[in-house]
């Protein structure tokens, strides 16, 4: 079951994110020059994906507000999705306070993030000699960010339910391992409020 889910998850991620693989290689190019600048550029470019992916993982914890009865349970396999905010489709390079790189054209300072439009990023040049240039990667026009998830809910005493969420460990070549889990609790506390039914 774990192998099947691993393959299914990898397949879903590759289907939805296959278009983002090539531009991510360009993030490595940002490492040429100054490491601090590379960190700022990579963070600004990739952060909208991380925020949206995190939001999609935070969705769908329940399908009903009523907790399970004692020892009742449900098992769910789902794909949560989040829509990246339009304000995260670009970022302003001039606000990053880069120390090695500067904008080749100061009037053109907005560049796409990974979730932005598929157009070339701005061109940077080294501040000291103006000989090296770096073209920032284009966006991937991601309208939504998916997250496949396994979830189990289990009923406890006192109208309480514990919910566990799991994304199995996946080894992504050259990037490392990725996994996550989370726990949530639901309680029907209205029984503790006098006169409330």
What is each PLM-predicted segment?
Residues 64-66, 75-77, 150-156, 183-189:
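Residues on the lipid-exposed face of transmembrane beta-strands in outer-membrane beta-barrel proteins
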Residues 69-71, 143-148, 176-183:
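Residues that define the transmembrane beta-barrel architecture of outer-membrane proteins
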Residues 63-71, 86, 159, 174, ...:
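Short loop/turn motifs that connect adjacent beta-strands in outer-membrane beta-barrel proteins
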Residues 71-77, 160-164, 183, 197:
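Transmembrane beta-strands of outer-membrane beta-barrel proteins
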Residues 23-120:
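Outer-membrane beta-barrel biogenesis signature
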Residues 79-83, 166-170, 189:
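Transmembrane beta-strands of outer-membrane beta-barrel pores
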Residues 1-27:
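Bacterial Sec-dependent N-terminal signal peptides
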Residues 62-64, 137-141, 171-174:
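Outer-membrane beta-barrel domain signature
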């Amino acid at each position: 079951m774990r192998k099947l889910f691993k393959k299914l998850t990898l397949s879903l991620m590759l289907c939805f994110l296959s278009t983002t693989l090539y531009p991510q290689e360009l993030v490595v190019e940002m490492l040429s020059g100054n490491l601090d600048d590379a960190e700022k550029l990579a963070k600004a470019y990739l952060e909208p994906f991380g925020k949206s992916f995190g939001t999609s993982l935070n969705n769908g914890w329940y399908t009903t507000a009523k907790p399970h009865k004692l020892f009742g349970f449900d098992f769910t396999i789902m794909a949560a999705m989040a829509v990246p905010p339009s304000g995260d489709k670009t970022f302003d390079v001039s606000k990053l306070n880069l120390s090695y790189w500067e904008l080749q054209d100061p009037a053109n300072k907005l560049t796409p993030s990974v979730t932005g439009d598929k157009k070339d990023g701005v061109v940077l040049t080294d501040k000291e000699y103006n000989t090296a240039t770096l073209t920032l990667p284009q966006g991937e026009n991601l309208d939504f960010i998916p997250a496949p998830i396994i979830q189990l809910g289990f009923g406890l005493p006192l109208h309480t339910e514990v919910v566990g969420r799991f994304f199995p460990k996946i080894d992504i070549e050259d990037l490392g391992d990725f996994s996550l889990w989370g726990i949530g609790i639901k309680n029907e506390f209205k029984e503790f409020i006098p006169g409330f039914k």
